[in-house]
Amino acid sequence: MPKNSKVTQREHSNEHVTESVADLLALEEPVDYKQSVLNVAGETGGKQKVAEEELDTEDRPAWNSKLQYILAQIGFSVGLGNIWRFPYLCQKNGGGAYLVPYLVLLIIIGIPLFFLELAVGQRIRRGSIGVWHYVCPRLGGIGFSSCIVCLFVGLYYNVIIGWSVFYFFKSFQYPLPWSECPVIRNGTVAVVEPECEKSSATTYFWYREALDISNSISESGGLNWKMTLCLLVAWSIVGMAVVKGIQSSGKVMYFSSLFPYVVLACFLVRGLLLRGAVDGILHMFTPKLDKMLDPQVWREAATQVFFALGLGFGGVIAFSSYNKQDNNCHFDAALVSFINFFTSVLATLVVFAVLGFKANIMNEKCVVENAEKILGYLNSNVLSRDLIPPHVNFSHLTTKDYSEMYSVIMTVKEKQFPALGLDPCLLEDELDKSVQGTGLAFIAFTEAMTHFPASPFWSVMFFLMLINLGLGSMIGTMAGITTPIIDTFKVPKEMFTVGCCVFAFFVGLLFVQRSGNYFVTMFDDYSATLPLTVIVILENIAVAWIYGTKKFMQELTEMLGFQPYRFYFYMWKFVSPLCMAVLTTASIIQLGVSPPGYSAWIKEEAAERYLYFPNWAMALLITLIAVATLPIPVVFILRHFHLLSDGSNTLSVSYKKGRMMKDISNLEENDETRFILSKVPSEAPSPMPTHRSYLGPGSTSPLDNSNNPNGRYGSGYLLASTPESEL
């Protein structure tokens, strides 16, 4: 430690140096505490340690602008689920009526918990491991669980990007390769591929040409080399986007976050001009109010809110940790949440405008096929021509005319009617067909685009949008893995990031087998749902009940410069934990009531069949959930019995129990005890104080406090005035 003038004079005169703590700090020249050497209390022989400043933020990267940060949060939270899951849930759960429970739960669960993660990340300026270690060391396992969940999600999520890459490259041809069934040679006769003839061209292309899928999860079938190459491309894209941290990913976000909105806007305009688009939108938003009383609707709405904002992954915390301390994260939480909701509604409009068009196409096809059946029955005298209304013209048969004719035949030929095999061809039935996930993106949407003018252009735009949506979410997911590990273990950023991508690619080969789609279903449905719910409820408890909601609100007031709404106090303290507990219980009950299974594509039947997971797959599923949640009890037990150090003796800064921030500027000037904290290891460490008045960077030399009348400073020594980062 650099010597002040008094100490220098006494050392030159060989006098015995005795300084109080206050004198040493008050007369100190500017100092760089990162190289200070302290004697730590409780260590035998006065062993010296280099106190590396754990919460140093001098070298921490920062966002180039507020816009870049907001786009990163939007890119992470707005993902493929907004495009293919929210519209499905909206249709399934009452149309416009579903928006009511969704909005209510967004306000009482989504925004408060999103704000909580933004606040702790911004204040403590560490990834998920460091943040929860500082808030409550015994719950430090939360951060490790978040990393594991991010790894599980990243493994299969990038496979979906790989699928989109495959379709993207296949879109540069006319006609689109999934617009017609392939023709095969059977000797000298050309016939349509039977599997395609029984299903549809787009369904066949997805299951056979793209996935080359096996009949069950137990039939591996070997690697699909086309998807293996696409997965390699996907991980290469992600690796290049995140290898330099936010310096590289931040720039990528300008395109990956904004481009999907351009595409959605173009699709909406084009979709509204399609015949039948209004039918789809009206069907979508026609409220079925009785659905609002169904508990299942509220459970699914809560789950969607929960995952739509990316809570519990650690990506939100990682991104906010690169913010300035005085950033208004209160505003950010509301802004990102409502942009997310707006995106979901926009995507729903686009999806059902397109599906309304598709429903009209399919309904007209149904009318033509059944009209041909009726003509056959008329020609064979199975039906009398007297049953056909006189104004019906088979050459220009409308949907209305067919419905009238169908009703007459069904009434007159009541007993023989089932044997005729006629369909009602109702538009409502087509619109009611629930489509979600890969079925929406790679079957329903691709089929609709085959009927678009200039279909290759729209196909390229659509799959490029999916790639960008997936990339934005993957950047946040990778940040949830790399940021806490790099912060905690100080590993080289570039090397660790590249290593993660290479490791994930090789593990991801599991998902590009012929049975890989079934593993994607398993990971998507079960590997993250329950663990993330547990993670977020423990985050809420750690801040609201262990640290204390009142103290947390005080810290936010100091950090933001204004007091957040009292609304958040009650949400964090009571409402959100209760809702999360109910959601966790409901998820566990759902697992027990409905045995886990998957939809398998049976080649011989050219149809899907729901199968239950075999015993080994159930064991894998349970292992995934256990591995994701195991760090929480393990770290708790190890720290409870003092088998794992909380690292307090290696920190240059220790913290009073139950305080995240300590501003010493308001303390009494002559109170020397203000520089000495409790020897009890911190239960809630915190970042550096907001206001620092007199110390700045400078040269250092070792500080030997063995002659100090107060004894060794111990682990409670407070670096009250280390310069605050410009971040």
Curated annotation (Swiss-Prot):
GO molecular function, one term: symporter activity
Membrane topology summary: Multi-pass membrane protein
GO CC, one annotated term: GABA-ergic synapse
UniProt keyword terms in alphabetical order: Amino-acid transport, Cell projection, Cytoplasmic vesicle, Glycoprotein, Ion transport, Membrane, Neurotransmitter transport, Phosphoprotein, Sodium, Sodium transport, Symport, Synapse, Transmembrane, Transmembrane helix, Transport
Compositionally biased spans, kind Polar residues: 698-710
Residues bearing PTM Phosphotyrosine: Y377
Cell compartments where the protein resides: Cytoplasmic vesicle, Secretory vesicle, Synaptic vesicle membrane; Postsynapse; Presynapse
SUPFAM superfamilies, per the entry: SNF-like
GO biological process entries: alanine transport; brain development; glycine transport; L-leucine transport; neurotransmitter transport; neutral amino acid transport; proline transport; protein catabolic process
Top-level division of the source organism's lineage: Eukaryota
Transmembrane segments: 69-89, 97-116, 141-161, 225-243, 252-269, 305-322, 334-355, 452-471, 495-513, 529-549, 570-591, 619-641
InterPro entries the UniProt entry points to: Na/ntran_symport, Neutral_aa_SLC6, SNS_sf
Region annotated Disordered, chain positions: 680-727
Extracellular compartment segments: 90-96, 162-224, 270-304, 356-451, 514-528, 592-618
Modified residue annotations for Phosphoserine: S13, S20, S665, S701
PROSITE patterns attached to this UniProt entry: NA_NEUROTRAN_SYMP_1 (PS00610), NA_NEUROTRAN_SYMP_2 (PS00754), NA_NEUROTRAN_SYMP_3 (PS50267)
Tissue-specific expression: Expressed in the brain. The strongest expression levels in embryonic, postnatal, and adult stages are found in both cortical and hippocampal tissues.
A Pfam family annotated for this UniProt entry: SNF
Reaction(s) catalysed by this chain's protein: L-proline(in) + Na(+)(in) = L-proline(out) + Na(+)(out); L-leucine(in) + Na(+)(in) = L-leucine(out) + Na(+)(out); glycine(in) + Na(+)(in) = glycine(out) + Na(+)(out); L-alanine(in) + Na(+)(in) = L-alanine(out) + Na(+)(out)
Protein purpose: Synaptic vesicle transporter with apparent selectivity for neutral amino acids. The transport is sodium-coupled but chloride-independent, likely driven by the proton electrochemical gradient generated by vacuolar H(+)-ATPase in an overall electrogenic mechanism. May contribute to the synaptic uptake of neurotransmitter precursors in a process coupled in part to vesicle exocytosis.
UniProt record similarity statement: Belongs to the sodium:neurotransmitter symporter (SNF) (TC 2.A.22) family.
Matching PANTHER family: SODIUM-DEPENDENT NEUTRAL AMINO ACID TRANSPORTER SLC6A17, SODIUM/CHLORIDE DEPENDENT TRANSPORTER
Protein name: Sodium-dependent neutral amino acid transporter SLC6A17
Species whose genome carries this gene: Mus musculus
Name of the gene encoding the protein in the UniProt record: Slc6a17
